[in-house]
Each structure stands twice: as structure tokens, then as C-alpha cells.
Amino acid sequence: MFLMIDNYDSFVYNLVSYFLEENIDMEIIRNDLVDLKYIEDLLEKGKLEGIIISPGPKSPKDCGLCNEIVKQFYKKVAIFGVCLGHQIIGHVFGAEVRKGKSPVHGKVHKIKNSGKNIFKNLPKEFNVTRYHSLIVEKENLLNDFNIEAETEDGVLMALSSKNYPLYSVQFHPEAVLTEYGHEMIRNFLDLAKEWRDKNANRS
């Protein structure tokens, strides 16, 4: 089962629907109602396959227990942050999260990506839809994270941890005008399974 941490966002059920189309089980929990012990229990019972941290209207400093979820579980289970979820991951690992030059709401921009991880087997450039006013500065992340995607003017659009199954995108993969949204979701599900399989073999 996958957990969707809902940051009180109007897009969350669009994102959920993309995941459910891949024939997975998913539970949705609001960011201030989630119980860390419940997540730990799911992990111990082998029931938790991954965590998705949804978009949301606020900031990483006002997101319920999301910061604690990332801190406590990023070494144990795959986590995928979307929009606010991306900013939360950056914030937890010491990045500056600040206002961009101007808000971008519903705008389509081209990104350049690594062709790896979330972007495996996808074109190196394609269009995504952005809804955000905050951006993550990459400078403090370079030791521990791969820069997976940026806009043409250098705004950070996606991250992955170098050592753990931690991934994030600033844009909305579930938006209609985002290209390859379903493929990115599938890639995350594959990455989550690879991590589970690798760690199961160790025990």
C-alpha cells in the first residue's frame, strides 16, 4: 500500500487518480491527522510500499507532520514529493526555500532532465505544468542530491537522493498539459519496488 499525505490541496485527488490507474492500493491521510507510529507499524508489517507528499497551498514551515515524515522514513521507504512535497524535502535537507522571481500558476514550461530515475526512458526535454510561488535553491543540496531537472533558466525542478529512495518534482505530473505524467508515476513505482526488493534480499 502507498500513503498519500494530503496537504489540503485541490490537486490531490487528480494525483491520486494517476496512481490508482496503476492498480495499486492507496490510503490518503491529511498532513495534520497522520500518525507517525501508524506509518512505522505499516513498515514493520511489510505493508508500506511508498509515501507520496502532495502539493499544497502553504509552505514547508506549515505542513503538518510532513517534515517529520521525511526525516523519520527517508532511509526506510521510497518517498516522492510533488510541488510542496519537493519544497519540504529541500527544506528538511537544508536548502533555502524562497519566493521565485514571480509566481507561476498553471503555466507550461520546458524542462531539461537527466533521463534517469523519475525520468528514465523519457525525452531529455519536455513540457511540464507549474503552480508555485516558492522555489528550492539547490546550492546546499549538491553533496547529497542529484539535480534531476531544471527549467531553461535554471530553476530547480526535480531532485533525487544519491543514497536513498527520495525523489521530488516541483511541477505537477498529474496536470493535463504536463507531458509524460503517467510515465513519471510508473517510474516512481518501479523505483519504490526496486528499493523494497533490494532491502528484502538483505534480511
Residue map of PLM features:
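Extreme N-terminal starter segment of soluble prokaryotic enzymes
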Residues: 1-3
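Acyltransferase
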Residues: 176-203
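Cysteine-nucleophile active-site neighborhood
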Residues: 45-121, 185-187
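Catalytic beta-strand/loop cores that center a nucleophilic Ser/Cys/Thr
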Residues: 117-163
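Active-site beta-alpha loop architecture of Rossmann-like, nucleotide-cofactor-dependent enzymes
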Residues: 11, 58-60, 176
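A short beta-strand-loop structural module common to alpha/beta enzyme folds
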Residues: 24-34
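Two-component/phosphorelay signaling modules centered on CheY-like receiver
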Residues: 17-25
